[in-house]
């Protein structure tokens, strides 16, 4: 059975990484069960294994942490729900691509509870929403904003790190980076989309939809 852990106060990033790694190691050894940890961080940027230095536009704005998860630069901060997912893929299937797709499907299903249509895009990991009310890009491409980021790491086929969904963060904090290395498109949140969703509301949706996507 998956243990659900929720932290009410913002968790410092180094502490979260240490806790995740310890839990993942314990799962791999058969000494602990799987877990999903719901939390928020103080304002910070993280750099994944594919991060480009040029995508860090304002290195002095918030602390920057190098991390060994997949992906590029992302922002974490208050008003953003982070879900660290520590699952044993030895029993759930040793397929990294399928695992990431299930994380995306989980986010999309949770957003659907609030009548938000999330979508994935080829070559752009994460979940996006159409913004037809915004002017298209100069080449005519319709505007889309990112509402959720995904970046995971596996050790002995146990996952850690996970995903983040924007509920009501300060979206200007994303200006210090090129989020996930993708130029042109922006970021949004549930509240930015005009929905009075709370963190507790999202947590209920995440828990319900997790079992639909991943099972027990």
From Swiss-Prot:
Q: What else is known?
A: In the reaction, the free carboxyl group of octanoic acid is attached via an amide linkage to the epsilon-amino group of a specific lysine residue of lipoyl domains of lipoate-dependent enzymes.
The reply to whether Transport figures as a keyword in the UniProt entry is: no
Q: What is this protein called?
A: Octanoyltransferase
Disulphide bridges:
none
Q: Which domain of life is it from?
A: Bacteria
According to its UniProt record, where is this protein located?
Answer: Cytoplasm
Catalytic-site annotation from UniProt: 180
Stated EC number for the protein is 2.3.1.181
**Gene Ontology MF terms in the entry:** lipoyl(octanoyl) transferase activity
Matching entries from PANTHER family are given as:
LIPOYLTRANSFERASE 2, MITOCHONDRIAL-RELATED, OCTANOYLTRANSFERASE
The organism is Jannaschia sp. (strain CCS1)
**Which residues are marked as site: Lowers pKa of active site Cys?**
146
Q: Which residues form the BPL/LPL catalytic domain?
A: 30-216
**Pathway where this protein functions:** Protein modification; protein lipoylation via endogenous pathway; protein N(6)-(lipoyl)lysine from octanoyl-[acyl-carrier-protein]: step 1/2
Gene Ontology terms: biological process: protein modification process
């Amino acid at each position: 059975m998956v243990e659900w852990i929720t932290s009410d106060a913002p968790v410092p990033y180094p502490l979260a990484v240490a806790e995740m790694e310890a839990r993942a190691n314990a799962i791999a050894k058969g000494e602990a069960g799987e877990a999903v940890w719901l939390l928020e961080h103080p304002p910070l940027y993280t750099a994944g294994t594919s991060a480009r230095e040029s995508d860090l536009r304002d290195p002095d704005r918030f602390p920057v942490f190098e991390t060994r998860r997949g992906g590029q630069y992302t922002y974490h901060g208050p008003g953003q729900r982070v879900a660290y997912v520590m699952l044993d893929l030895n029993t759930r299937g040793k397929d990294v691509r399928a695992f990431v797709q299930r994380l995306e499907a989980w986010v999309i299903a949770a957003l659907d509870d609030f009548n938000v249509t999330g979508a994935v895009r080829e070559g752009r990991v994460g979940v996006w929403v159409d913004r037809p009310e915004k002017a298209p890009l100069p080449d005519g491409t319709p505007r889309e904003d990112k509402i959720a980021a995904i970046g995971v790491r596996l050790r002995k086929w146990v996952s850690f790190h996970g995903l983040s969904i924007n509920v009501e963060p300060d979206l200007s904090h994303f200006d210090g980076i090129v989020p996930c290395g993708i130029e042109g498109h922006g970021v949004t949140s549930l509240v930015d989309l005009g929905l009075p969703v709370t963190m507790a509301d999202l947590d209920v949706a995440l828990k319900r939809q997790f079992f639909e996507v991943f099972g027990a």
